[in-house]
Amino acid sequence: MSILEVKNLSHGFGDRAIFEDVSFRLLKGEHIGLVGANGEGKSTFMSIVTGKMVPDEGKVEWSKYVTAGYLDQHAVLKEGQTVRDVLRTAFDELFKAEARINDLYMEMAEDGADINALMEEVGELQDRLESRDFYTLDAKIDEVARALGVMDYGTDTDVTALSGGQRTKVLLAKLLLEKPDILLLDEPTNYLDAEHIDWLKRYLQNYENAFVLISHDIPFLNDVINIVYHVENQQLTRYSGDYYQFQEVYAMKKSQLEAAYERQQKEIADLKDFVARNKARVATRNMAMSRQKKLDKMDIIELQSEKPKPSFDFKPARTPGRFIFQAKDLQIGYDCPLTKPLNLTFERNQKVAIIGANGIGKTTLLKSLLGIIPPIAGEVERGDYLELGYFEQEVEGGNRQTPLEAVWNAFPALNQAEVRAALARCGLTTKHIESQIQVLSGGEQAKVRFCLLMNRENNVLVLDEPTNHLDVDAKEELKRALKEYKGSILMVCHEPDFYEGWMDQIWDFNKLT
């Protein structure tokens, strides 16, 4: 029996259709991976099933008494709350039960109280608390907080002082502590390092309840799911098995469809040729009419148009001086130092990956090297003739510009055709190009930002988690382009599969701090 069912769902933004009469079901204990290219509608689907977005048509039906938890990276956290306060809200129901027990004991002291009835309710509530390990909640909170790296910045920290990545980890920890019947996870690994991803993988493998997962981290996704829903061309298709099994079946179905299409096209050509040659002759007119009827009744096989794939190409600028950045006794941070004094040298033509736990200062280091924020102590010497291209991890939301407007405003010397061609090279369609940036998926927004980088000549690329939100094809194309880039690269990245094998150096930030 389904615990979540979506029936005849259709939805779009303006004239851009996202879903067309699709259905979906989630059975108890299923581990579903929701997969598809950037912009196909995966996050939109999550927003619809959680009620954050109302579909144009169709129904979303939840079973009675089913609890669901959604990793909402935009949830509002109250000022004055500590990390522990937020994590303890995962057990609000149990704290209410404890408060009810205290009220019942107060009622027992009143004249005429029905002691037996009150004690029976106390017993039921007490059993519920003990079955949920209520009296060891803080130990459970500490266990999950430690496993996801939340302990790195402490559970007594005010949540409003957290970065976007730290905040997301707190929300993920709270969600896992709630242990709902259905987990809805949209890119949960984006802000996790390798150690924490491994823990989350083991947790989800052993999760006895159901979940729906969106992730472009394919090895992680493959290891935790047993059902795939593929989002493509406004449709949702269900496959049994893990991601790699889905790929095999999908490739086979696609190959079979293409072969059937070729056979049918040949048959159509032969029939049309026969009709054209024989319809005018009395002796063969009936045969020609018979062939024409066969053509008219034929169910035509249609191949879906290929989705545009990005083709990244970063232009090098003139050669800079030998040294790009030289940090001397550099201490970074905002109110207090995040590191010991750092002495780092980044030279011309080097490609360096910065790795390490989230929230310990990798982004702050990049911004300090670039001069965006001042150091607490020490200095940064920047080389001569630098042409810097910077890709930020987090950007402000609510951008009402279209990609066409954003790129054209940045490069007014280009004509409209040139701007459209530049965006198309990044894998964006006409509908993407003419939609507001704020309604695009995370991956599509990243492609707009890459387009801005590609149209400038840079001799240094500084990239902060550039693979976040990118689908598999875009990620592979980005890797190829960066490997071939003739300038210097300084990149923060949490995906070993992306940076290993072509970087000159790996700076482990855990060791620098």
Which stretches of residues belong to each language-model region?
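Intracellular alpha-helical coupling/juxtamembrane segments of multi-pass membrane proteins
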Residues: 250-304
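Post-kinase regulatory C-tail/linker adjacent to protein kinase catalytic domains
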Residues: 312-314
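ABC ATP-binding cassette signature C-motif
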Residues: 1-259, 308, 317-513
